[in-house]
Amino acid sequence: MTETGAAVLHARRADDDDLALLLLIRHFELALLDLFGRGELNGTTHTCLGQEYVPVALRRLLADADHVFGNHRGHGHYLARFDDPAGLLAEIMGREGAVCGGVGGSQHILRDRYVSTGVQGESLPVAAGVALHLKRTEPGALACVFIGDGTWGEGAVYEALNLSSLWRLPLLVIVENNGIAQSTPTTRQMAGTVRARAEAFGVRHHGIESSDLSAIRDELAPLVAGVRSGGGPLVVEFATHRLGPHSKGDDTRDPETVRQARDNDWYRLYAEADPERFARADEAQRARVDAIVREVSARPPSRWRP
C-alpha cells in the first residue's frame, strides 16, 4: 500500500488528542516563523514542520520515568512531552514564565527528565550514560534520544552505540531522516545506510515509512517493550520530510524535492482523509496558538534566577 493509501485508511483512527497535538505543533512552528519574520524574535530557530508526527506517535510509548533527549529541531519533542506551548514560547521570546528563565532559547531546554541541545551528536553519549544509570537503579525505564541523519557524521554517535550494545543499555534512538543534513543531501554525505551502521555494532534497527500514528505504535510497541526488558538498544529510523529550509534562510533544495516533501506531508494526507473533522481541529489549534502568542508577547521580560 502506498503512503497516501495507508494514511487515508488509518487517519480516521487518530483520536482527538493526537490530532490536536499534531496541529498544535504545526501552528506553533508557523507562528515562530511569523514572529521571526516580523523581527520579534532574536537568534535563530529550526522548525520541525513535516516531522511533527514522529514525537506525537512516540508519546504514548514513553513513560514518565523515561528520559527524553531532543535536538536543535526539538520544539515538537518538547510539546509532545509536556503540551506547554506558552512556556516554550516564553523561553524563545525571553518572557516571564519561560521554561528555563529565557536563557536557553529555541534549542537548549531542560525540564524534569527532558533536555534538548543544539550540539549535534552530543546528546547520544549523554543518553547512553543516563541509560546505564536507569539500568542500575530504575529497571524498566529507558532513555530516548532524537537525532537526524546528519548526526551520523559525528564520532560520538559510534562511541555511544558501541558501549550501549556492549552493556545492553535501555537506549531508544529515534532517527528523523529527512534526507538532508542542513544543506547537504544525505546521499552526498553518508556512505552506506543508518541500518548498516547500527547493525555493525549489534544494535537492532527498525525502519518506519508511514506517518500513520496507529500503525507506527502497533509496530513499535513490542520493540520498545524489548528495550525496557533488557533487550538492548534499538535504532528506529523514520523516513520523514522537512517542509522548510534548515533554519530561517533560503531553501537550497531543488523544487522537485520540496514538492515531494509537500506531497507526503501528514497534514495534507490527514486533511484529505477526514476534511470536516480536520478543519475543526485545525481552526481550534490555530486560534489557540494565536491567543498564546498575544498573551506571551504582552508579558514582561524574563529574569534568570539561578
Listing of model-derived features with the role each one plays in the protein:
Residues 15-18, 63, 119, 229:
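A generic structural signal for short, non-catalytic loop/turn and secondary-structure boundary residues
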Residues 27-33, 38-167, 185-195, 200-202:
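Cofactor-binding active-site loop characterized by glycine-rich and histidine/acidic residues
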Residues 22, 68-70, 89, 236, ...:
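Generic structural hydrophobic/aromatic packing signal, biased to beta-strands
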Residues 1-55, 60-61, 246-306:
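Conserved acidic/glycine
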Residues 4, 100-104, 229-231:
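Feature targets compositionally biased, intrinsically disordered low-complexity regions
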Residues 112-301:
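Glycine-rich ThDP/TPP pyrophosphate-binding loop and its adjacent helix/strand module
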